[in-house]
Amino acid sequence: PVSALLHAVAVVKAGAFGIVRLVYELYGVELVQTMNLWQPLAYLAAFTILFGSFMAVFQEELKKRLAYSTMSHLSYIILGILLPGQLSTMGALLHLVNHGIMKITLFMCLGNYAEKYGVHKFKELDGVGKKMPLTTIAFTVASLGLIGMPMTAGYLTKKYLETGAKNAGEVWAVYVFYISSILSVFYLMPIVFRALFGKSEKETKGKGLEVNPLMLIPPLITAFLTLLFGILPPEPISPLKWVQYIANKVYGGY
């Protein structure tokens, strides 16, 4: 749980939140856009998105794979902040929340695999999905969310980011998001497939199926939120309401 909190929310989001404050409160959107201060950082963020996604594909250690994924998705937030326009801002702020929910689900699921069967590397996943079906369902839902499948929180995020980039005339950024999503399929879905369809040679008799309910319930809740925020985005419980309010405040004067 501590690893999930640190790697998905507490520490890694601090830098992204700092840039949000820097751009929107210290300099202001109008100054940043007028002086084109956003462009060099936007290109750097785009490079980091692709680099993190590409590196994640080749990681054997599961937590390291998610760490590179986090590097990539934090740069989604930075790029969305830097791209001109209200929709990009909404996508960035929405991803600040949604990514935390989806990524903490993935880390908690990996923690469950490690706790129950000592799984830390990709090659050790064989058959664990059949032994821990609920954990694997939660992992699958969060993975589909990060990829950007419809009816997930991740789809809503990418919809705003991509539409915002198109409206700003920065079509290159749309292709960056597309390529990253494709790479996400290659580093997340093999985990699901190997967990479900890999043949395990280890003896697990007597170990039971899932982990303690105290470790199982949290990822199921966050996986449910991944779906809920994608299916009911306009509802008051959705982060979208707060994101719209913040974006309106930021761009209200322009």
Predicted regions and their residues:
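Cytoplasmic/organellar membrane-interface segments at the starts of transmembrane helices
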Residues: 132-135, 185-254
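Hydrophobic transmembrane alpha-helices and their helix-loop junctions in integral membrane proteins
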Residues: 1-193
